[in-house]
């Protein structure tokens, strides 16, 4: 079992295991499940993601027709994707244990920031990175999201949440590429995670999903709220 990213790295080095294998083994131990059951469970989650993607138009392209459909060209196998999902899950589990993954607890840094770190770690795995690369990718992604407030307009998870998700996704790709280029995080990932916890604790409640501050209290947000009230 592990309680930090460094724990995972140490296990990988001591037992000659891959990052994803350590996470899968922990899942098996926690749920008293055999390897096949753990794998099937993760495969089902991946399938659910692919099924959700089917609602989008696969032929959709940019106005010029030069952009779109590039994800399909990467050609990763289901096995590679599931390995990456285990990696992402491992990072997420550590963040959840040592900090938070809820905006109501730690601000949006705990939601989109955590998701971005998880995605960056998974992307590094897909690119064949080492366990150390994975750790740096997660650290670099999360550092860029520290201090992000959770200030949804009208308390709805729409504005500015949807746009911030895009920023988190791009941040994850960038962080993974930086890590794969050999750039390291000056602050270890576990310390970055703890920093997120401390920042979240220092945040006022108005910036923790209460719609009591930030963008949720702008004049335009007030007008949007009035419009909703008229519809009730």
Identify what each model region corresponds to.
Residues 116-232:
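Functionally critical mobile loop/hinge segments
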Residues 1-66, 182, 189-232:
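Generic N-terminal targeting/processing segments that precede catalytic cores or assembly contacts
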Residues 34-44, 73-76, 80, 160-164, ...:
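Catalytic cores of large soluble enzymes that bind and process phosphate-bearing ligands
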Residues 64-147:
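Phosphate/pyrophosphate-binding betaalpha-module
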Residues 54, 58-63, 102-110, 156-163:
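A short glycine/serine-rich beta->alpha loop
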